[in-house]
């Protein structure tokens, strides 16, 4: 957080550290998204980084008052607010835009983490998968190009770039 504040002096940084209680995590999450929405309404283009959506969802799960649980120990309705927060990303025609980039914990061995990931996987429009084996070989960024991609990538890339990516993925 300190490094972000130093590197981005004009940015608003909202953070909640591990030593704070879950109510603080949920309160900051909701405050940050509401602030972002107001800026978009004023015509600003906002970029929000959520690290991690898994931890944020866990916090909302821990503050959930519902005793009924789904598989993985996630409370019924516990993901409703995190889903709404993540769904706030948009590009408006008359005002600004809100882009949300969220990290997710995967392959942790936790059924809850798997359920949270699957809940948000279909909501996003791109997925960037990092690979530990690539990082161990000191290649950075350690992106797994076979598991990474975006919806409608043909709108972002020139045809020759898209052809090369498809060729790489087919190998």
What are these regions (language model features)?
Residues 1-171:
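P-loop NTPase catalytic core
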């Amino acid at each position: 957080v300190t490094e972000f504040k130093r590197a981005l002096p004009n940015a608003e940084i909202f953070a909640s550290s591990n030593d704070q209680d879950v109510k603080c995590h949920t309160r900051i999450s909701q405050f940050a998204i509401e602030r972002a929405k107001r800026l978009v309404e004023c015509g600003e283009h906002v970029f929000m980084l959520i690290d991690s959506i898994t931890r944020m969802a866990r916090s909302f799960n821990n503050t959930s008052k519902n005793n009924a649980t789904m598989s993985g120990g996630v409370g019924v309705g516990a993901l409703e607010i995190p889903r709404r927060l993540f769904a706030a990303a948009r590009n408006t025609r008359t005002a600004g835009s809100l882009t949300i980039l969220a990290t997710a914990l995967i392959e942790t061995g936790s059924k809850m983490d798997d359920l949270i990931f699957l809940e948000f996987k279909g909501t996003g429009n791109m997925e960037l998968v990092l690979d530990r084996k690539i990082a161990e070989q000191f290649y950075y960024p350690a992106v797994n190009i076979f598991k990474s991609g975006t919806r409608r990538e043909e709108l972002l890339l020139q045809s020759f770039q898209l052809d090369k990516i498809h060729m790489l993925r087919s190998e």
